């Protein structure tokens, strides 16, 4: 993981912004956004008993990739003869990679502190990931 943080689950301050965003129709054709509504700002409704959320960030490229990759990507994008696959879509599905690593993290934590309830999400649940990650630092 590139970064790990912990956040509380009280996202009440984010609810008005989420409600306004949905009311304005900014979710477009992503109907699931409206379907879950304000539940996204209430992690404890999704997993009852939730007291904290561990957030994790994983970079798409390894650190030893060097700084030239951005230049290489921009050159490829500027060439109309080339098709470019987004960086996140190359290699193994990041959902599976993150899910596996987060599950291992939960198991290691349980070894240290004892069993605890948890559920691993990787862009797969109706939660405000960015809000939680921001609060987690």
Language-model region placement:
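Auxiliary alpha/beta "docking" domains used to position bulky ligands
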Residues: 1-137
């Amino acid at each position: 993981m590139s970064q790990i943080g912990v956040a509380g689950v009280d996202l009440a301050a984010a609810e008005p912004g989420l409600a306004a965003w949905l009311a304005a129709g900014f979710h477009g054709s992503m109907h699931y956004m409206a379907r879950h509504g304000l539940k996204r700002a209430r992690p404890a409704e999704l997993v009852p008993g939730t007291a904290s959320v561990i957030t994790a960030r994983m970079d798409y490229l390894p650190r030893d990739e060097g700084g030239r990759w951005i230049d290489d990507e921009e050159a490829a994008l500027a060439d109309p003869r080339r098709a470019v696959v987004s960086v996140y879509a190359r290699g193994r599905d990041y959902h599976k990679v993150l899910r596996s690593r987060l599950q291992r993290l939960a198991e290691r934590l349980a070894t240290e502190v004892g069993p605890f309830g948890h559920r691993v999400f990787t862009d797969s649940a109706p939660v405000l990931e960015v809000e939680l990650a921001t609060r987690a630092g």
